[in-house]
Amino acid sequence: MFAASTASANDDTQYHITSQDDSLRDEVKKNVMLYLDDFSTPDTDNLAYWKKLVKRQVSQALQALGYYNSNITVSINDSATKPQVTIDIAMGYPIVIHQSHYQVTGTGQSFKPFVTQRNSYPLVVGSKLDHGSYQTVKNAMMDIARAYGFFDAKWMKHEIAVDLQTQSAAIQLTFDTGSRYTFGKISIAKEHASNDIIHAMAPFKEGDDFTSDAIANYNISLNQSRYFTSVQAIPALPNPLTKQININVTAVNRPRNIVEVSAGFTSNLGERGRLKWVKPWINRYGHSLESELELNKQEQSVTNNYKVPHGDPNLDYTNYVLGWRHTNNFNDTNNRYRKYSLQWQRHQQINEDWKRILLLKYEREKDNTQSATRTHLIPGFSYIRERRIGGITPNWGDRQFVQVEVSDKAWGSQSSFYKLSMRSNWLRQFNETHQLLFKLDVGYISANDVNQVPISMRFFAGGDNNLRAYDFNSISPLDSNNKSRGALTQLLGTIEYSYPVKDKWRFAIFHDVGTVGDKFLEDKYSDAGIGIRWETPVGLIRLDFAKGLQSSDIKRFDKPFNISFAIGLDL
């Protein structure tokens, strides 16, 4: 005999479900309990009436799954603290579909989503009647209609005829899609300097077929543009005369001037500071300006970035970048070099996943250690794919980056070389708890002499984002003064595992390995460590403790230890 016992949702009555003939299936039992959970204990002393109500509730649960000839026996014991109801069920045979007619009419009858849904219709002749599946079919067609702009769609006929004598059912379904609506005009709540940009970011134009995905993507683009404090695009009511849907946009622009201040600390660089000044709006075309000052004891830099959008400012724009950078040699208060640069960058989203950047940069670099001044004109390109789920503290994502830069005396550079950089980072989460982060960074420079390559383009390792036990940019071949001079190749890797220990807090362990030299795999370095990750509204805060694993003849590389503090996931 099958028996089950559980309490109703109101916890005033305890139900025992039994099946003397062992016919009760698990799915049916669960459905009966769902119906009883929603059943309120009647306020009455009339046990006969109470039994009748319980029996009717159980009967409805069985009929929903196609069992119309079940035998239900109800007995009630009200002498206990909580009334106890015993229900014995003999399911009987289910209703079988002997006729099923399903027709789709209207202008959308050959529309692929409707056709796909129609072809997956489960209530075919010979199958068991299931009212849940029947309702799911109806809801699915209406969901498709709303998602793709068939706002006049309706069920012309939807009925089930059950014959208890023959234990059979006939289903009649006729769905009329009506006409498909198109996008109308974009209406902005009040006049904005941003009107042109708001229109340019729309992934549709007037007269295009309506889709709810287009509206969702439009809202994402508007909110990612960094022009607005708040912005929302909402479809108006469908116009049955024009068969169009206008889009209403409400937007509040960001302040004309924004100042951001941030700070960090590592045991090798000490305090770090950043001051950022942003003008989100320069004019009605969406031009913007960002100026950034970064300071630490090793490096100081100023960057000015003027952005000119061409259509959607998230996907298609040009950056003009003016920069100055001053870097000290490792453990040396003397200046290592100064660099002035001017860059042109053309950013374009070439497909759903990949972004392309064409670049041309002019660099003038003064190296005090060699009393040399070099100028280079360097064209190049890069391809980037970035995916993430979870906002500013993602739990899934990856980033792929490939870049090629070329310098040649033929167009006025002081030396000829080319540089290839590749990075691949992956973040994955398992069982909603375990997170793994993998990072691989490969670089190669083809040059006759490393001194022909600007210092800022050579490879160094060490710091917050790779080989964390080692000082910032301290790992590279050494010059005649025993100072890091940069390298022509690099190969770096990281594996990191983190586990939640408290809400918003994760414990991490990691292992970094790498080599930086004029040839691949010349010298190998590695470290291991532990860290704390804290998810905050401003991003992921990382605190790491890293210890080097290799001994070295060079004192500063002999099993170093560093503490680093940073904001943001290194993805």
Give the label of every model feature segment.
Residues G106, N328-F330, V406-A410, L549:
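A generic structural motif
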Residues F111-P113, T211-D213, N217-F401, Y418, ...:
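Gram-negative/organellar outer-membrane beta-barrel architecture
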Residues A9-K29, L36-S267, K276, E290-V308, ...:
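Periplasmic polypeptide-binding modules associated with outer-membrane biogenesis and secretion
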